Amino acid sequence: METLEAIRIDLADYEYAGEGANGVSYNHRHNPDVMLKLYRPGLVQQPLDEMNIARKVYEAGIPTPEPGDFVTDGTRYGVRFRRIRNKVSYARAVGDHPENLVRYAEEFAQMCRLLHATHVDTTAFECVKDKYSRQLVENPFFTPAEKDRLLRFILDAPDTDTAIHGDLQYGNALFVGDERYFIDLGDFGYGYPLFDIGMVYATAYISEPDFVREAFHMEPATSVRFWQAFAPVYFGTDRPIRDIEAEVRPYAGLKTIIVERDMGKPMPTFREALKPILHP
């Protein structure tokens, strides 16, 4: 485990900007080019890991805000980034302007296509297969037989050296004017793109309705429409969407491994998507 002395900051120099599942964001009161993300109390290694990965991702040429210092306010730890002024996430944009949903979905799909066509240094990042295999071992809610089937599915996925965001959903993609950025890259790696696309599908068809409303600022039906506009642009219009969904759904179900770990209990809604793997 890497250690690094965190720079002490005065939170009075920052103003609240928003929050997500892992922490709270702030903007610097006196420097408009600096923003801060502080993780929940007790999380130290996670923000350090995110900073290190974000720096590697930035240096690899992936469009993402430039990371700065590892910091603490005395209770929480986090990272300073270059602030992208006037930026909007695709989730917020769809929630505020659903009449532009198709355009936003198409732009996000093109971002994802470019990301998944980007070759990366495989010595610098974790293979997505290795990540899921490791997390599967740590999940206490699957039987040994279920773990065997899931592991076989994971390992049978094609091998590629192209970029994987790791938490690919439209709240983690920003735009301002013609510029586009990915954020929250703590799980960045490389591998088969459907491990990523499964998350986009999950936000439409698997995530709990209240979670969609809170995290993505839209009604569940709107998230379904977003997926239906996204899929033909990402996969091409020559494939029926039902065939696309049949291929993607098991990868969406793999999020069960992570969600159950975080929630500390089995998640039947997510497990439903694993039926093609567990009960072929």
Residue ranges and their predicted role:
Residues 171-197:
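Catalytic activation segment of kinase domains across protein kinase-like and atypical kinase folds
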Residues 237-248:
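Short, surface-exposed acidic
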Residues 197-238, 252-268:
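Active-site activation/catalytic loop segments of kinase-like enzymes and analogous catalytic loops
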Residues 1-7, 265-280:
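Regulatory N- and C-terminal appendages and interdomain linkers associated
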Residues 33, 78, 161-163, 180, ...:
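Hydrophobic "anchor" residues on beta-strands that sit immediately upstream
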